Each structure stands twice: as structure tokens, then as C-alpha cells.
Amino acid sequence: EKRKLNWDDKLTLEFNGKSPCVSELTIERTDNVPTVFLCGNSTVVDQDNEPWGSWGQMIPRFFNENICFANYAESGESANTFIAAKRLKKALTQMKPGDYVFMEFGHNDQKQKGPGKGAFYSYMTSLKTFIDETRAHGAHPVLVTPTQRHSFGADGKIQDTHEDYPDAMRWLAAKENVPLIDLNEMTRT
């Protein structure tokens, strides 16, 4: 993780364009502004190279200074590997009551096979850990179903490649009374 700029105690700023220019910059700590912690995989992570991009790196553009975003996502992560890599634990150390945790998993979880794996087994168990830990810190969990893959059938329509994972998340959101953003349905064309 040391190769990643977002995994240390430093603030990393990036200025883009043909002639980036900054005349002044003021950085002030604001503990009274809620933070949205983003947990997920490559569809959420701050992508390093263009033309790649994710909703996680774009979403802050739609909000003002009254909310902060902290993107803890990492390419290749599943819900259980995110926990095992201590990415959730790190986010929890920064979390305060009133914050939010948006979690989108399913792409890499769906690829895991074997005993105890599956949408209604290890996937839901891991998501329940996110929900419980988030609530224990006084923050608000929000489940986000996995965005559709760019996979089209012969008829030109999106192929559903996530199997039961979106349904498992929808079921868990209803059972645990957790808000759900159904990105899976929103990205179906």
C-alpha cells in the first residue's frame, strides 16, 4: 500500500490541465462537516490513469463544501478482502458520528467460488460486518448495488453478470433497514 498516495497521513493534491495554476491554497480542518466514506472496488476507486474513471472519484463534483468524501476503495477488492486488508478498519479510525459509509461490492465477490462463498453466504456476512461496524461508530451505512459490467448480448442489451449479488444486497438492505442506492438497476440500458 505504500505505493498508493491515499494510504498514508499525507494530503496529496493533483492539478491537471495544460497550464495548471494555483495562486493560493488554504487548508483547514473541519470536524463539523460530515464525511462520506467510499468503500468498494475499481468502479469506486480514484483511478490513476485516464481514460479510466469511477463514480467514486466523480461524485464529489456534485456536492459543495458542506460534505467531505474519503475514498478508501481499491481495485480488485471484494467485501471480504476489503475487510481482511484492514481498509475498513482504517476508515473506522477516521469515522465520527453522523458520517456515512457507501459500500459497493459484488464484481469481485461474484468471482469467488467454493464452500461458504456466494451471494447469500460470505458476501452478505461481509456486508453485515460493514453495517454493524459503521453503526457502532455512530455513522450511517448505505448499500450500493454493483454497477453493470459493459457486457452486451447479441441483441445489444446489457447482460446481467452479477448473478444473485444485487438481489442479496437488496434483501440485506431491507432486512437491516439500510438505505440502498440501486446502481445495478440505474446502469441497466
Region locations from a protein language model:
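Glycine-centered flexibility motif
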Residues: 1, 53-54, 76, 106
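Acidic/histidine-rich helix-loop elements
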Residues: 46-51, 71-85, 111-118
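Alpha-helical cap/lid subdomain in secreted, periplasmic
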Residues: 58, 86-189
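Beta-sandwich interaction modules
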Residues: 2-6
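Intrinsic disorder/low-complexity detector
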Residues: 10-11, 111
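Serine-esterase "nucleophile elbow" of acetyl-processing enzymes
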Residues: 11-74, 88-101
